[in-house]
Amino acid sequence: MSRGIIIIGSGFAARQLVKNIRKQDAHVPLTLIAADSMDEYNKPDLSHVISQSQRADDLTRQLAGEFAEQFNLRLFPHTWVADIDADAHVVKSQDKQWQYDKLVLATGAAAFVPPVAGRELMLTLNSQQEYRACETQLRAAQRVLIVGGGLIGSELAMDFCRAGKTVTLMDNAASLLASLMPPEVSSRLQHRLTDMGVHLQLKSQLQELEKSEAGIRATLASQRRIEVDAAIAATGLRPETALARRAGLVINHGVCVDSYLQTSHPDIYAIGDCAEINGQVLPFLQPIQLSAMYLAKNLLGGKAPLKLPAMLVKVKTPELPLYLAGETQRRDLSWHITAESDGMIAKGMSGEGQLRAFVASEDRMKEAFALLKMLPV
């Protein structure tokens, strides 16, 4: 490959892919282009920055230049890719262009901000760059509204509460983690957050944010008003697909790829939070790590279909940590819950009596690995 491989993006997926490529080929030309600084940080740490009094710069693990030297790369930080000419195999920015043999989209996902009046007052914590932009406000804030009771919202609510802040956690659903598990399973976390002092506003919808003398006034659809110092959107992620769409690639929720991580164009691939693998968007670390292993082989001339085993997802809520695995969101499962003082095991069983999902908390989390082996692949 005389022109080599170009990767657009510099997050976890891009870095894992670089490491896997270099394990197999030390010399193929590798170029990374990204809009950020390309310094490495651990994105899950963003869920704990406030309680641990970390500044954005504290999260940096490796500078971009060190990464480039270690893995023999060309890096183009702070560079927005404007267009891809898929037929000509050319990537274009405003003032540069690069030719490639193979192209990988690792463009990630953007935080979704609800389309309410005053949405510009809402903060997001989806990157080191976003945290850097709002860290002074967040550290000073005493009253915090978090909109969204999913994984990130629950993690942030616990973290801000542990830091001594007054936290209101709001969601349209009747329970936390509603898209991941039934309320009888998530209720243990819900009670723990309430016991810690988090104010839950479930079955509630944000209608408007506006500046007030006391900070920010949040008005709910019920017309209840809450005065806060900061409002955070934790209402999910949307895969970054605009560049792929302009290149003429097939898009659904994410950039559509097959088991080889190949898009609708044979020389363009996608990985990470932007990719939709055979109909599934999997924005978790383990599937990204495995995707990087297989994609590296495919980029270097192999033909290795991605095989994903049953995988654990960890909810990073230190006062009540959780593992979940399998099809926890299925509505037709029968849940068998054993809850004791040291933790909980909830097993989701099919009508045929087969284990299809489970959730484990606290000291019972050590049982998760044995249960994982019982899940169908």
From Swiss-Prot:
<comment type="function">
    <text>One of at least two accessory proteins for anaerobic nitric oxide (NO) reductase. Reduces the rubredoxin moiety of NO reductase.</text>
</comment>
<keyword id="KW-0274">FAD</keyword>
<dbReference type="GO" id="GO:0005737">
    <property type="term" value="C:cytoplasm"/>
</dbReference>
<dbReference type="InterPro" id="IPR023961">
    <property type="entry name" value="NO_rdtase_NorW"/>
</dbReference>
<dbReference type="InterPro" id="IPR023753">
    <property type="entry name" value="FAD/NAD-binding_dom"/>
</dbReference>
<comment type="pathway">
    <text>Nitrogen metabolism; nitric oxide reduction.</text>
</comment>
<keyword id="KW-0285">Flavoprotein</keyword>
<protein>
    <recommendedName>
        <fullName>Nitric oxide reductase FlRd-NAD(+) reductase</fullName>
        <ecNumber>1.18.1.-</ecNumber>
    </recommendedName>
</protein>
<keyword id="KW-0520">NAD</keyword>
<dbReference type="InterPro" id="IPR050260">
    <property type="entry name" value="FAD-bd_OxRdtase"/>
</dbReference>
<dbReference type="Pfam" id="PF18113">
    <property type="entry name" value="Rbx_binding"/>
</dbReference>
<keyword id="KW-0963">Cytoplasm</keyword>
<keyword id="KW-0560">Oxidoreductase</keyword>
<comment type="similarity">
    <text>Belongs to the FAD-dependent oxidoreductase family.</text>
</comment>
<dbReference type="GO" id="GO:0016731">
    <property type="term" value="F:oxidoreductase activity, acting on iron-sulfur proteins as donors, NAD or NADP as acceptor"/>
</dbReference>
<dbReference type="Pfam" id="PF07992">
    <property type="entry name" value="Pyr_redox_2"/>
</dbReference>
<dbReference type="InterPro" id="IPR041364">
    <property type="entry name" value="Rbx-bd"/>
</dbReference>
<dbReference type="InterPro" id="IPR036188">
    <property type="entry name" value="FAD/NAD-bd_sf"/>
</dbReference>
